[in-house]
Design a protein with these regions (language model features):
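Ribokinase/PfkB-type carbohydrate-kinase core domain
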Residues: 1-131, 137, 164, 188, ...
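Conserved post-catalytic alpha-helical subdomain immediately downstream of the catalytic base
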Residues: 135-201, 206-208
Length: 208
């Protein structure tokens, strides 16, 4: 798994990621990638140019910015995409990415901010030529740090379960992220069972 933060840290980190992602692909490993742009580390334009070069080696893409995916006319397929995109728009974008890079899975979260302490989260997910939309979960925030990583780790875990339906994969990833928002610190210290209970509409209760 690769994060877009690492190549932003230094030129040497960038060179290391270049070598690692190519070596992983050569070995037949599944490569997951979260572009994860941080404006405090580099410009959007530089990040887009660098991170987009990794796409031919990526199997699972988690997030669609700041990469570029060009149409035949040179425009980006994501141009005009809102913060609350429709299912049809996400389906169009996912299919355009898949057409160019032939990925196993693509995911993108959508966050609704109701207040500083109350948000909702859902995700769109693409696999096997079809787009899926998760349930929308509402939650109170204890600590937002690590929510994106919890989504990524939840998605990766779910993808490793060979018998899970696509709907369960995306709903598990969203529930994993939501669960992290109730836990202080960077790490999602919870269990698969707790995430599944939340995924299946059980009460939001972090059990210690």
């Amino acid at each position: 798994h690769l994060s877009g933060i690492t190549p932003a840290l230094s030129y040497n980190c960038r060179r290391l990621i270049d070598k690692a992602i190519k070596a992983a692909k050569k070995l037949g490993l599944t490569v997951s990638f979260d572009p994860n742009f941080r404006s405090t580390l580099w410009s959007f334009e530089t990040a887009r140019d660098v991170l987009s070069k990794y796409l031919p080696y990526v199997d699972v893409l988690i997030g669609i910015e700041p990469i570029h995916v060009y149409n035949a006319d040179g425009t980006d397929v994501k141009d005009g995409l809102t913060m609350d995109p429709s299912f049809e728009d996400m389906d169009r974008v996912f299919k355009a990415i898949d057409e160019q890079y032939h990925m196993k899975a693509i995911a993108r979260t959508v966050r609704y901010v109701h207040s500083g302490s109350n948000n909702s989260l859902k995700a769109f997910y693409y696999a096997d030529g079809k787009t899926y939309e998760s349930k929308t979960l509402n939650f109170e925030i204890v600590d937002r740090v690590g929510g994106g990583d919890a989504f990524s780790s939840g998605l990766i875990y779910a993808l490793m379960q060979n018998d899970w339906k696509h709907e369960d994969i995306v709903n598990f990833a969203v529930a994993s992220s939501v669960m992290k928002h109730a836990i202080r610190g960077d790490t999602n210290i919870t269990s698969v069972g707790q995430i599944k209970r939340l995924m299946n509409n059980a009460s939001f209760d972090v059990q210690r």
